[in-house]
Amino acid sequence: MLGKIAVEVAYALPEKQYLQRVTLQEGATVEEAIRASGLLELRTDIDLTKNKVGIYSRPAKLSDSVHDGDRVEIYRPLIADPKELRRQRAEKSANK
């Protein structure tokens, strides 16, 4: 008989953060945790085929198992290339 585990699912926007606590069966996956959280219904901008996910800042797959106390994170896509932004800042400070 499988026991229950408690997992948090997080999704952060610049203006608002979502943190949902869900109870699942042992052996549940990252995808099951996200679906149980209700965030897919709250935020239509989340697309599990495009958004990357992780557990405590470490990349994870939707099929990975979650454990009691885990925090599943849904990441937003990057809007700009970090390398390009650093290059632009370096050029700007060099021109001062």
Swiss-Prot record:
Q: Which PANTHER family match?
A: UPF0125 PROTEIN RATB
Q: What is this protein called?
A: Protein RnfH
From which lineage does this chain's organism come?
Answer: Bacteria, Pseudomonadati, Pseudomonadota, Gammaproteobacteria, Enterobacterales
Q: Which family does it belong to?
A: Belongs to the UPF0125 (RnfH) family.
Species name for this entry? Shigella flexneri
Q: Which NCBIfam families match?
A: PRK01777.1 (NF002490)
Family annotation (Pfam families): Ub-RnfH
